[in-house]
């Protein structure tokens, strides 16, 4: 169940440097501790390992996510444009997604992120379509790409 279900994710993170794995797992705990009733959706994609939290089991309802790349982690908000970034710390100029680059705990403005998470979660709940069966507190592996580009592999 949920936060304790970490085996698949740890396996997906094996090719990444220790500091990147540590940041990803610390950020994961950070979100799980704040939103234990949500679901973690994991994607072992071609370019990166990504996982996010959703009040449902649907990717469209994800309110925050972590993307693990070669030398850092992106911690972001799928609809980050929908709420204010008072401190102007979020990166991104697309139509929806905003994020922080995180390399260490010291890089991460945890108290400010808690405010952003609250807004992102409320936004996701407000946009959520009715579901027949509500799934809560689960870790769900949504996809595993058969071919991956990871640190240390030939491009």
List each language-model region with its residue ranges.
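Charge-dense, helix-prone N-terminal extensions
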Residues: 1-155
């Amino acid at each position: 169940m949920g936060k304790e279900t970490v085996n698949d994710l740890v396996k997906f993170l094996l090719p990444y440097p220790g500091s990147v794995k540590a940041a990803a797992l610390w950020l994961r705990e950070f979100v799980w501790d704040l939103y234990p009733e949500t679901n973690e959706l994991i994607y072992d994609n071609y370019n990166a390992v990504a996982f996010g939290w959703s009040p449902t089991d649907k990717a469209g309802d994800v309110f925050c996510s972590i993307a693990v790349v070669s030398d850092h982690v992106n911690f972001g908000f799928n609809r980050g444009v929908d709420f204010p970034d008072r401190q102007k710390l979020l990166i991104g100029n697309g139509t929806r997604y905003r994020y922080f680059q995180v390399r260490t705990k010291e890089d991460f403005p945890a108290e400010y992120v808690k405010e952003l998470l609250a807004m992102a979660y409320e936004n996701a709940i407000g946009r959520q379509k009715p579901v027949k069966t509500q799934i809560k507190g689960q870790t769900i592996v949504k996809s595993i790409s058969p071919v991956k580009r990871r640190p240390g592999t030939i491009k």
